[in-house]
């Protein structure tokens, strides 16, 4: 099965998406390596259904220790005090776009931290975004009904999106 190529509608980049924290993990290494992209993603499908029933666009998933991890389909980042944070990657697929964003931050002196962080730290973020092959860097408007930062104002996300677009343009020229 090959997924259809889809592009995030432009209005999503202006409005952002909503996330709902779910009680479903991405996967445990003893049952299914969460770092691998596999055909068996029942847990991610169930997480997405749970989030959509709660009125959200996607599910925010925690790791087995309760730290923020990933969404049901994309990697997750937050911005706090001018620093970009993402999970350790121990319980999520370490995507290509995720790594490109990490590399761009390092190359352009944007502080980037790959670390464990709590849901409460996430609620206090100035910005949050997802990374994925089709979504690039998609802003998050709210998590669990809590607005993240100032709606529609995402200076760090815009900076990273511009750097990412330039990288793609250079690589495909």
Please tell me what each predicted stretch does.
Residues 1-173:
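Helix-start/capping segments and mature chain N-termini
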């Amino acid at each position: 099965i090959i997924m259809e190529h889809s592009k995030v509608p432009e209005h999503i980049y202006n409005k952002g998406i909503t996330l709902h924290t779910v009680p479903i993990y991405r996967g445990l290494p003893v049952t299914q390596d969460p770092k691998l992209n596999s055909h068996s993603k029942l847990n991610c499908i169930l997480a997405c259904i749970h989030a959509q029933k709660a009125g959200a666009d996607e599910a925010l998933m925690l790791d087995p220790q309760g730290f923020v991890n990933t969404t049901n389909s994309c990697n997750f980042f937050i911005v706090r005090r001018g620093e970009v944070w993402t999970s350790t990657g121990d319980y999520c697929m370490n995507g290509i776009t995720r790594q490109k964003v990490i590399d761009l931050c390092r190359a352009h002196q944007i502080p980037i931290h790959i670390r464990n962080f709590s849901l409460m730290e996430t609620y206090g973020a100035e910005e949050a975004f997802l990374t994925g092959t089709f979504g690039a860097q998609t802003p998050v408007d709210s998590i669990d009904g809590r607005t993240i930062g100032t709606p529609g104002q995402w200076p760090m996300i815009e900076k990273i999106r511009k750097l990412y677009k330039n990288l793609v343009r250079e690589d495909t020229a």
